[in-house]
């Protein structure tokens, strides 16, 4: 299983220029059929999808032209614990992200009188989850989320023009520091 959510907002000239929210999820199945490993995947989660997955595994195994055998990984006895910084992506509102994006753009414009344009100010967030299970008892799950911000600016000083930007990829919303 894999699933995730994403959010993206961009500002230009004090207004929202782009706004996207998306969710996706899917499940993949691998299995042996006729001595060969087949695989199939779907983004549907209904009774018909189960039948289509099974039929897809059979069909893909039948179409294989190699005699090489894939192996279903039985897993390890132990896995290391990965320390992750706690994220507040799930509890941060769209309104707060929009406000932060507009603020990033406004502060970039106001930072120096030589700044003539802020062509990009963006705030995004993403979260994802992956679950791996198999017939040997493997049952692993991982999830994560983060924010992303980007601001670019154009400055002029006489005949000289400079372009610069700032990127942040924090786990917590307050890590996006204008």
Please place each PLM-identified region on the residue numbering:
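Active-site bordering "gate/hinge" segments
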Residues: 1-178
């Amino acid at each position: 299983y894999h699933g995730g959510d994403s959010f993206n907002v961009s500002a230009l000239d004090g207004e929202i220029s782009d706004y996207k929210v998306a969710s996706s999820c899917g499940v993949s199945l691998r299995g042996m059929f006729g001595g060969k490993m087949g695989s199939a995947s779907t983004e549907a989660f209904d009774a018909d999808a189960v039948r289509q997955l099974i039929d897809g595994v059979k069909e893909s195994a039948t179409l294989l032209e190699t005699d090489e055998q894939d192996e279903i990984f039985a897993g390890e006895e132990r896995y290391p614990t990965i320390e992750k910084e706690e994220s507040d992506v799930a509890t941060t509102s769209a309104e707060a992200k929009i406000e932060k994006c507009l603020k990033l753009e406004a502060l970039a414009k106001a930072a120096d009188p030589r700044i003539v344009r802020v062509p990009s100010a963006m705030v995004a967030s993403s979260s994802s989850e992956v679950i791996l299970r198999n017939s040997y008892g493997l049952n692993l799950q991982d999830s994560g989320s983060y924010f992303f911000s980007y601001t670019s600016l154009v400055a002029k000083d006489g005949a000289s023009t400079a372009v610069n930007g700032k990127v942040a990829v924090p786990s917590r919303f307050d890590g996006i520091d204008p």
